[in-house]
A protein has these predicted regions:
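Extended, charge-rich low-complexity regions and/or helical-solenoid scaffolds
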Residues: 519, 523, 544-633
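A transmembrane helix-and-boundary motif of multi-pass membrane transporters/channels
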Residues: 1-228, 334, 338-341, 345, ...
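Soluble C-terminal extramembrane regulatory/interaction domains of multi-pass membrane proteins
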Residues: 177-181, 185-188, 235-353, 590-692
Length: 692
């Protein structure tokens, strides 16, 4: 028996299934009591809007209401205007859907749902009434009322019975990220790096990180306090820096071990103390222990005159990179504690860097535009086929094609998900036919109807809580509710049922085939484009810009990295290459930030470094692959380092130190494992980059 119950959903999932079913029946009963023409819309809306958590339910309710209202108003406006020219009406509907879909792709939070829904609500309302345009107002009004009813019931019932907050789930995700990040950092600190393990941990950290943005957007909808929401955003803004900071530290330590083994002994006690401190921060991160570790690190930092020696510069750079990681980790842990305790006290950062700023999402507008265009063209082609075939109920095929293309437009490879949509919709037709022709004829009152729905709907609703079942179960329950088309009186005709409801799977099958033809690229194309965007941004750094523009670009590059790494892993490419390219850009940004503070030969050489790095990546763009770093660039880096050490800049201690560390970091990112070299060492073979 224990084995049997092991696979059963937990009690809280069953509570959610019962609660959602009860809400759907309440919405259905009220809609029938008010004699609404399509009460099943209210029932289906409950399942669409509901979530196990208060925040997502509230936000989906709000944004679904906004999207439905906008789409209904568009239908009332466009249908009477273009009903005499059906082909033009089709183009207008397709453009409306595509434009709003394109706008929704710019948003990565829950509010994108409002725009996407407004886009496909127009065909949902407009296409069924093209033969009777005078009914468009009635249909738009009825759909709006019934959906608003379903939204209201779902929100009220969800808030009153067994409400769950999203905050504990957010805490669990943060703990998962920290568990991976702790092991990841520990492997590099102890110099026990296993490539497969590190790659797996990196992938887990990125996947967890990418789920946090949507959750952060939901927290205000369940009443999270403003300071807590600010802290979650600060935490995410620091999490995104950890991977490049650890990668830079690893390269600095590797170069130290390879070039100056005599200095490794001085570094070892600090690494051991840092590893011990890392383990101690699992439950708390007191500032006093962080300060003691920082003091130990600062005591090892060479003085300004010693940096003329490149071995001492290597040592100093390794200390600087370790200090960055220590400060960043302290901030992350202190923010985690503040979020968990819901502290409303102002939070104080210890990791301070000019590049820290508000997260700016990177958007590949080219792919977004193409995705919207493929949706527009799918709607137009499907509509033309419907008109030419003269299929009375073919509008349902166009509607579901529009819905499917919109739902999965943001995916690199939407075809498999559209096929799942098709499969579960086809199953819903089968389930609806069983109910409509075998079960409902034997029912004579509403309580019997509730009992007939109870077992399968509660079971399926319970399974929607689990991510692996969510899409299939939600489609099954929503489509079955819609296809049964429950109204005030039983009126079922098999031919009418088959004609109207088989159109949906046909439309989805068309959307699947169309997507295979129009979007066969998958993650490979997205990864390739993201690589080229990175190179273009590095080339663009040779152009004049303000510090604020550079800060925005740096944060945007970090966001792009979080999109790039999963795609590289999915296509079997080395994720370390993308990290190095990001570090090239970040070190260039540091050079550009501090270069205006120096004059003369050092300034000329710093400008030359930036220009030559830009030329190098311009050559990579032209070649279509990452080329070996040219020897001339490496010599320029070495000359610049010597100029900073020999032009009387020792008085500009902080500026000089930042520039030297940026040069060292840039060199290591371009050529891992090697530091500043003389001309005699430039004959050594340089590592090839990953082909584009």
């Amino acid at each position: 028996m224990n084995g049997f119950f092991t696979g059963m959903p937990p009690a809280r999932d069953w509570f959610y299934g019962v609660r959602t079913f009860a809400a759907s029946m309440i919405a259905l009963y009220i809609a029938m009591l008010m004699q609404m023409p399509r009460p099943y819309w209210a029932m289906a809306t409950v399942y669409i809007v509901s979530s196990p958590f208060v925040g997502p339910t509230s936000s989906k309710a709000l944004y679904r209401a906004i999207g439905t209202f906008l789409g209904a108003m568009a239908a009332v406006f466009f249908v009477p205007m273009f009903v005499q020219t059906p082909f033009l009406l089709v183009v207008v509907i397709a453009l409306w859907t595509g434009i709003l879909l394109f706008l929704s792709l710019h948003l990565r939070t829950a509010n994108s749902y409002a725009l996407m829904l407004a886009g496909y609500t127009l065909p949902l309302i407009a296409l069924p009434v093209v033969d009777n345009p005078l009914a468009v107002w009635d249909v738009a009004e009825a759909r709006t009322e019934e959906i608003f009813l379903g939204i209201a019931v779902a929100a009220v019932v969800g808030a009153m019975f067994w409400p769950r907050r999203l905050a504990p789930v957010f805490d669990d995700s943060v703990r998962k990220w920290f568990a991976d990040a702790t092991v990841y950092s520990q492997r590099f600190l102890t110099r026990n790096v296993q490539p497969e393990e590190v790659s797996s941990l990196r992938g887990g950290m990125v996947a967890t990180f990418n789920t946090l943005e949507l959750m952060i957007g939901q927290l205000p909808h369940e009443g999270a306090r403003p300071q807590t929401v600010r802290n979650t955003k600060e935490l995410r803004g620091r999490m995104i820096h950890l991977l490049p900071v650890v990668d830079a530290l690893d390269d600095a330590l590797y170069a130290l071990e390879r070039r100056t083994p005599e200095l490794v002994g001085q570094f070892a006690p600090l690494l051991a103390a840092t590893t011990e401190w890392l383990q101690s921060t699992t439950h708390e991160a007191p500032v006093q222990r962080w300060r003691a570790l920082r003091d130990q690190l600062e005591a090892l930092q060479p003085d300004a005159e010693a940096l003329d020696d490149r071995h001492q510069l290597l040592f100093s750079n390794a200390l600087y990179r370790l200090g960055e990681w220590i400060d960043l980790w302290q901030d992350c842990r202190s923010l985690q504690a503040a979020i968990h305790s819901e502290s409303q006290a102002p939070w104080r950062a210890v990791y301070r860097h000019w590049r820290l700023g508000r997260l700016t999402p990177f958007l590949d507008r080219g792919l977004m535009l193409y995705s919207a265009f493929s949706t527009v063209s799918a709607i137009i082609v499907a509509s033309v086929l419907w008109i030419l075939l003269g299929w009375t109920d073919g509008g349902s095929a166009v509607i579901l094609a529009a819905v499917a293309c919109s739902f999965f437009a943001s995916m690199d490879d939407p075809a498999p998900q559209i096929y799942r949509f098709f499969f579960w919709t086809a199953m819903s037709v089968l389930f609806a036919s069983l109910y409509l022709f075998l079960i409902l004829p034997n029912l004579h009152d509403f309580p019997m109807l509730v009992l007939a729905f109870a077992v399968p709907f509660i079971w399926v609703g319970t399974l929607t809580v689990q991510p692996r079942f969510y899409l299939g179960m939600l489609l099954t329950i929503v489509n079955t509710s819609s296809f049964i088309s429950i109204q005030g009186a039983y009126d079922a005709d098999f031919l009418s049922f088959a004609n109207s409801n088989l159109a949906g799977p046909v439309g989805l099958l068309f959307a699947f085939i169309w997507t295979l033809i129009a979007r066969p690229f998958g993650a490979e194309l997205a990864a390739k484009r993201l690589t080229r965007f990175s190179w273009r941004d590095i080339v663009g750094l040779t152009q004049p810009a303000t510090l604020a523009e550079h800060r925005r670009l740096g944060v945007q590059m970090l966001d792009r990295l979080m999109q790039h790494l999963p795609r590289l892993a999915m296509t079997g490419q080395d994720t370390g290459v993308a990290l190095r390219e990001l570090r090239v850009a970040l070190n260039l940004l540091d050079l550009l930030a501090y270069a205006p503070r120096v004059l003369g030969v050092p300034r000329v050489l710093l400008d030359q470094v930036v220009a030559e790095v830009g030329e190098y990546f311009k050559a990579c763009l032209k070649a279509g692959e990452r080329l070996p770093a040219p020897s001339g660039l490496l010599m320029t880096l070495d000359r610049t380092r010597r100029a900073l050490n020999g032009q009387g800049l020792q008085g500009e201690g902080e500026t000089r130190l930042h520039l030297l560390h940026a040069l060292s970091g840039l060199r290591l990112a371009l050529l891992p494992g090697v530091e500043f070299v003389g001309t005699g060492e430039l004959d050594a073979p340089l590592p090839d980059g990953a082909p584009l």
